């Protein structure tokens, strides 16, 4: 996209907003005729033709054949130009980073998975993220001017509108993390919560898209426990961007201190860290597991250990996971009673167990939810696995770049 077009769509003028609206229409519908655009904008055909011409000249859209219907002259179809711009998505995990690139049409062209990383709340750890993004740009011979936005998914409480992170990398309270990243990397940057990124990935390219649903709850069962909400085709952020704190609803009288500072949070009994604690305690209590040697050597269990043990059908780990599934299902039943979604997606590291966790969640949901509400809700395991966060980050980068300021 040309600098002039980018400047146009950034303006609050009617002309600029019309162009931005056309871009968003094509993001949602892939193609459109001139008549479609005229109707969408409530403008005349000549005005629509002028807008489409300027978008074409700006490198944003292109002709994509003709709509072959009826008789007479077939109308030209317009769609986004894949070479009109690129978007980088960054998914930050506890022990690695995934980085990917999509073009304007949403096609993924580069994916770098499993870049070693240690997530710590330090300036040094933040600098590593910046360095890896710059290395990705260099490695794939990308030009900074062609990158229209970068979106970084980060765990914790994030306000994507202001660009502030409230748990990690908040070293400069008066400066949004997004602006710090943008200054360091040299291009526009947005940030969002990791679970919302995963939810958006499944919504745009995964399970929700495959099933054609418009409302979905994404439950992220990983080291922590999070929730992403897609309501009527839109991410629900809440007033300050803090929606989805499922792991921190007060459920238990267990006196276990959560990292949020409260006691009795759902995450203290249902999460990867809770599973590590429970498995280690039961092994030390005399129960057998494939993880017994490591625990007795004094090693701390990691998520990868639990996932590997479940894949090997370790009875102790599967028993703990099934108990967690039943407890989580009870809380998901409450969410279904409140939101009545079309779909509940069970994702995250611990969901990749051949549907084992999902089965126990579903059994519990059927027990604790109202059947008249649940009967139209599907519960499915996420289809994208570890790719969900990266795909969501890429798609969020594109969505954020073209957000409309007024409807």
Residue ranges and their predicted role:
Residues 63-65, 189-193, 229:
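General beta-strand structural signal in soluble alpha/beta enzymes
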Residues 87-91, 147-151, 216-220, 226-228:
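Short glycine-aspartate micro-motif
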């Amino acid at each position: 996209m040309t600098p002039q077009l980018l400047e146009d769509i950034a303006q609050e003028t009617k002309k600029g907003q019309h162009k931005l609206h056309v871009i968003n229409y094509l993001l949602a519908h892939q193609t459109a005729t001139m008549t479609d655009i005229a109707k969408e904008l409530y403008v005349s055909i000549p005005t629509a033709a002028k807008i489409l011409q300027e978008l074409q000249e700006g490198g944003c859209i292109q002709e994509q054949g003709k709509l072959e219907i009826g008789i007479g002259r077939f109308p030209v179809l317009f769609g986004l130009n894949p070479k009109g711009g690129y978007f980088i998505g960054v998914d930050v995990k506890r022990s690695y980073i995934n980085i990917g690139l999509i073009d304007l049409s949403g096609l993924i062209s580069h994916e770098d998975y499993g870049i070693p990383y240690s997530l710590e709340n330090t300036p040094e750890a933040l600098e590593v993220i910046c360095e890896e993004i710059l290395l990705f740009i260099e490695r794939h011979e990308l030009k900074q001017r062609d990158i229209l936005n970068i979106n970084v998914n980060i765990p914790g409480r994030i306000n994507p509108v202001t660009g502030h992170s409230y748990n990690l990398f908040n070293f400069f309270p008066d400066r949004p993390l997004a602006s710090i990243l943008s200054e360091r990397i040299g291009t526009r940057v947005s940030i969002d919560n990791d679970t919302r990124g995963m939810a958006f990935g499944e919504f745009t390219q995964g399970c929700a898209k495959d099933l054609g649903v418009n409302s979905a709850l994404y439950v992220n069962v990983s080291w922590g426990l999070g929730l992403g909400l897609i309501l009527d085709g839109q991410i629900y952020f809440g007033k300050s961007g803090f929606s989805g704190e499922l792991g921190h609803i007060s459920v238990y009288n267990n006196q276990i201190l959560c990292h949020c500072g409260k006691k009795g949070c759902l995450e203290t009994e249902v999460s990867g860290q809770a599973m590590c604690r429970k498995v280690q305690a039961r092994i030390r209590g005399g129960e057998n597991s494939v993880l017994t040697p490591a625990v007795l050597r004094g090693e701390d269990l990691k998520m990868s250990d639990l996932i590997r043990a479940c894949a090997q059908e370790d009875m102790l780990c599967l028993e703990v996971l099934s108990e967690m599934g039943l407890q989580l299902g009870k809380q998901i039943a409450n969410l279904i009673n409140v939101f009545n979604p079309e779909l509940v997606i069970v994702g995250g590291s611990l969901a990749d167990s051949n549907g084992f966790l999902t089965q126990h969640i579903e059994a519990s949901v059927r027990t604790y939810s109202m059947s008249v509400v649940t009967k139209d809700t599907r519960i499915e395991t996420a289809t994208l696995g570890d790719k969900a966060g990266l795909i969501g980050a890429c798609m969020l980068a594109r969505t954020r770049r073209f957000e409309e300021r007024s409807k």
